[in-house]
Amino acid sequence: MSSTGENKNQIKIKFFTNEEDESLQVADTPLYVPVTLKRFGLSEVVNHLLGNFKGEDETKAPIPFDFLIDGVLLRTSIEDYLTKNGLSNEAFLTLEYTRAILPPSFLASFNNDDWISSIDSINPTTKIVMSSQLSISQPKILSGSYDGIVRTYNMSGKVEKQYVGHSAPVKAVKWISPTRIVSAGNDRQVRLWKTSYEEIIDEDEEEIEDGKTLALLEGHKAPVVDLAVDTQTNRILSAGYDQNIGFWSTNYKEMTSIQPLEYDSNVVSSSSKKRRKMAVQDATIRRRAPLSLLQGHSEPVEGVIFDAKDSTVGYSVSQDHTIKTWDLVTSRCVDTRTTGYSLLSVLQLPQVNLIASGSSARHINLHDPRVTTTSDQTISKLVGHTNFVVGLTASPHNQNMFASSSHDGTVKVWDVRAEKSLYTITRQDGSTNAKIFDVCWDDRIGIISGGEDKKLQINKGSDIAK
């Protein structure tokens, strides 16, 4: 006779998954579960249906799952979800389940000589490695620093190569191939670098190899703070505080040669021996002009990216509160979206058709670039950081996920299907005093972050985002 009372506390649901692994599929038969269940309880139900139990057989060990209702991650009990959405427990819910994102735990920390402004990485299966026809045996980390030096690290934390040439803080670094990189900095320079190809590094070799400057790419009249590389077209975008975007080739032979006209004025004014020495050294280096300069922003440009699906399209964000879409064939701006705050970083999530932009207002905007510009252009805002959001990086495993770095001293992991961040990463000692200037998510290495504490920190979850 108590079944009516029990039914009040239960709800009819059906499970489904888009996981490709057939062993994770359950029957779509409806069943009743308590409305008080949250993610953990629902995960137990699915594991029971899959026949997964704790025991000696690791192949049948329980798997942590996340759950979505109408494409939104469930972060409360079913009962709270019903209340929030004005539904009764007579509703019939369809729940999607997917492998859960496990917390990214601290893995390692590598020391650097100065603040770290920019990070990039490659591993044996990275797109730029596969397309270069050069193989590498181990992942590598690239860092740009406020001491003006670009460095590559191996996974033991050893600096393998360094690139000395910038006369002011380096603000952006990117891999072009295993033997080519590009960097940019406050000295207004974009530099193409070359290093010898060494598949096997001698771990006992104490001498750090110096990279060689292939060419100086000149055209900006103020600090250059961000770079994007498209390996399919061999093109580079640069974001300048002169309000311009540089469009370059990764091959210096494709750009017009220029003379070192008034070169001394192009070096940050200083009487330091280091900068005068650099200027003398650079006097013999080939210089190239940009293929074009994209003009349209009215304040410093903070971030640039290529469209992942169409290399002739680029996006930029600026302190002028706008995100612009560019036709790189004609060098024309084809779309401008205006916000109410300075935009400091930009990222594309191509599979879900979203552009994310980090702001000075501490939140992250998400918008669909395919949607015609309207007064309400933002699809959603992700709130959680307490200071500027200056770095964004996509998950290499999950099309809905990305990470952000902030001046609040943290890195946050996000899923666009959830209203709040999934996890917050602090420094190893738990502190949040030092600003985090950049973050890079590598599918082999993990989440790499760096900033004022002069450390490259690596965090990784065993099944994060898989």
Swiss-Prot record:
<dbReference type="InterPro" id="IPR015943">
    <property type="entry name" value="WD40/YVTN_repeat-like_dom_sf"/>
</dbReference>
<comment type="function">
    <text>Component of the NOP7 complex, which is required for maturation of the 25S and 5.8S ribosomal RNAs and formation of the 60S ribosome.</text>
</comment>
<comment type="similarity">
    <text>Belongs to the WD repeat WDR12/YTM1 family.</text>
</comment>
<keyword id="KW-0853">WD repeat</keyword>
<feature type="repeat" description="WD 3">
    <location>
        <begin position="219"/>
        <end position="258"/>
    </location>
</feature>
<dbReference type="InterPro" id="IPR028599">
    <property type="entry name" value="WDR12/Ytm1"/>
</dbReference>
<dbReference type="GO" id="GO:0070545">
    <property type="term" value="C:PeBoW complex"/>
</dbReference>
<feature type="repeat" description="WD 6">
    <location>
        <begin position="384"/>
        <end position="424"/>
    </location>
</feature>
<dbReference type="GO" id="GO:0036170">
    <property type="term" value="P:filamentous growth of a population of unicellular organisms in response to starvation"/>
</dbReference>
<dbReference type="GO" id="GO:0009267">
    <property type="term" value="P:cellular response to starvation"/>
</dbReference>
<dbReference type="Pfam" id="PF08154">
    <property type="entry name" value="NLE"/>
</dbReference>
<dbReference type="Pfam" id="PF00400">
    <property type="entry name" value="WD40"/>
</dbReference>
<keyword id="KW-0539">Nucleus</keyword>
<feature type="repeat" description="WD 1">
    <location>
        <begin position="124"/>
        <end position="163"/>
    </location>
</feature>
<feature type="repeat" description="WD 7">
    <location>
        <begin position="431"/>
        <end position="466"/>
    </location>
</feature>
<dbReference type="GO" id="GO:0110136">
    <property type="term" value="P:protein-RNA complex remodeling"/>
</dbReference>
<keyword id="KW-0690">Ribosome biogenesis</keyword>
<dbReference type="GO" id="GO:0036180">
    <property type="term" value="P:filamentous growth of a population of unicellular organisms in response to biotic stimulus"/>
</dbReference>
<dbReference type="GO" id="GO:0000466">
    <property type="term" value="P:maturation of 5.8S rRNA from tricistronic rRNA transcript (SSU-rRNA, 5.8S rRNA, LSU-rRNA)"/>
</dbReference>
<dbReference type="GO" id="GO:0042273">
    <property type="term" value="P:ribosomal large subunit biogenesis"/>
</dbReference>
<dbReference type="InterPro" id="IPR020472">
    <property type="entry name" value="G-protein_beta_WD-40_rep"/>
</dbReference>
<dbReference type="GO" id="GO:0051276">
    <property type="term" value="P:chromosome organization"/>
</dbReference>
<dbReference type="GO" id="GO:0005654">
    <property type="term" value="C:nucleoplasm"/>
</dbReference>
<dbReference type="InterPro" id="IPR036322">
    <property type="entry name" value="WD40_repeat_dom_sf"/>
</dbReference>
<dbReference type="GO" id="GO:0030687">
    <property type="term" value="C:preribosome, large subunit precursor"/>
</dbReference>
<feature type="region of interest" description="Sufficient for interaction with ERB1 and association with 66S pre-ribosomes">
    <location>
        <begin position="109"/>
        <end position="466"/>
    </location>
</feature>
<dbReference type="InterPro" id="IPR001680">
    <property type="entry name" value="WD40_rpt"/>
</dbReference>
<keyword id="KW-0677">Repeat</keyword>
<feature type="repeat" description="WD 2">
    <location>
        <begin position="165"/>
        <end position="203"/>
    </location>
</feature>
<dbReference type="GO" id="GO:0030447">
    <property type="term" value="P:filamentous growth"/>
</dbReference>
<comment type="subunit">
    <text>Component of the NOP7 complex, composed of ERB1, NOP7 and YTM1. The complex is held together by ERB1, which interacts with NOP7 via its N-terminal domain and with YTM1 via a high-affinity interaction between the seven-bladed beta-propeller domains of the 2 proteins. The NOP7 complex associates with the 66S pre-ribosome. Interacts (via UBL domain) with MDN1 (via VWFA/MIDAS domain).</text>
</comment>
<feature type="region of interest" description="Ubiquitin-like (UBL) domain">
    <location>
        <begin position="11"/>
        <end position="99"/>
    </location>
</feature>
<protein>
    <recommendedName>
        <fullName>Ribosome biogenesis protein YTM1</fullName>
    </recommendedName>
</protein>
<dbReference type="GO" id="GO:0043021">
    <property type="term" value="F:ribonucleoprotein complex binding"/>
</dbReference>
<dbReference type="GO" id="GO:0000463">
    <property type="term" value="P:maturation of LSU-rRNA from tricistronic rRNA transcript (SSU-rRNA, 5.8S rRNA, LSU-rRNA)"/>
</dbReference>
<feature type="repeat" description="WD 5">
    <location>
        <begin position="338"/>
        <end position="377"/>
    </location>
</feature>
<keyword id="KW-0698">rRNA processing</keyword>
<feature type="repeat" description="WD 4">
    <location>
        <begin position="296"/>
        <end position="336"/>
    </location>
</feature>
<dbReference type="InterPro" id="IPR012972">
    <property type="entry name" value="NLE"/>
</dbReference>
